[in-house]
Design a protein with these regions (language model features):
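C-terminal end segment of the histidine kinase catalytic
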Residues: 201-233
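Two-component histidine phosphotransfer core
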Residues: 1-202, 212
């Protein structure tokens, strides 16, 4: 019971920090919409599209009424993020998202999937001069979900792969204070919290070839506890 209370307090503290970062979000959304409409009037369709994608992303960041979202909703955010990054990297970034239909209504903590995609983009594609790919795959595996984020970027040495996997498996609130890959650690902590530590992390890859992160979690359904929400094939 004490451990559960500590986890709830930690989660509430994280949500409070998110609330502190909301500097009049409605003003921001209205401003973005004004810029988008102005761009459309000037027939600057590409700029309008970029602003629209940015608004989608920003709305997810500031709306913390519920930490859980469906896989379908999280994938909308992933698509918006990758589409925006495509404007930045051009032909250097290609991506493919493959989600099995029976996974769409399962729930994941908000912004977890996109955190791993962002990591693949920044640490994989950004440091590579030649074109690369990011693959996002989600499918059913036994009694849960298997989430796979693969990039054909710069990759990592074996020691770094092992270090990253260990950090993900041992992710804790305390680790968030130490800097480093804070986004990844934050995502791992929340995945551990909502699944009651019933999550598996695996990191594979090769330097100069790419990296694959695999996450296995129960298939959580809205309004149910972890034990009740596991859905078999």
């Amino acid at each position: 019971k004490l451990k559960e209370q500590e986890m709830l307090v930690s989660q509430k503290n994280a949500e409070l920090l998110a609330l502190h970062s909301q500097i009049n979000p409605h003003f921001l959304f209205n401003a973005l919409e004004s810029i988008r409409m102005h761009s459309l009037l000037k027939k600057e369709n590409e700029t309008a599209d970029m602003v629209e994608k940015l608004a989608i992303m920003q709305r997810q960041y500031v709306e913390w009424g519920n930490d859980a979202v469906t896989v379908a909703k999280e994938c909308e955010f992933v698509k918006a993020y990758l589409a925006l990054q495509k404007y930045r990297f051009g032909e250097r970034l290609n991506y493919n998202i493959d989600i099995e239909a029976d996974c769409m209504e399962c729930q994941v903590p908000k912004l977890t999937l996109v955190t791993f995609v962002e990591n693949a983009c920044v640490h994989g594609i950004e440091s590579k001069s030649s074109p690369g790919w990011i693959f996002v795959r989600i499918g059913r595996q036994e009694e849960g979900l298997e989430i796979e984020i693969e990039d054909t970027g710069s990759g990592m040495a074996e020691a770094k792969l092992t270090e990253l996997q260990n950090n993900m498996c041992n992710a804790s609130i305390e680790m968030l204070k130490g800097g480093g890959r804070v986004g990844i650690i934050n995502a791992c902590v929340r995945l551990k919290m909502v699944t009651e530590n019933r999550v598996e992390f695996r990191v594979e890859g090769e330097e100069g070839v790419g990296t694959t992160v695999t996450i296995r979690i129960p298939c959580l359904q809205e309004g149910k506890t972890d034990a009740e929400s596991i859905v078999s094939r």
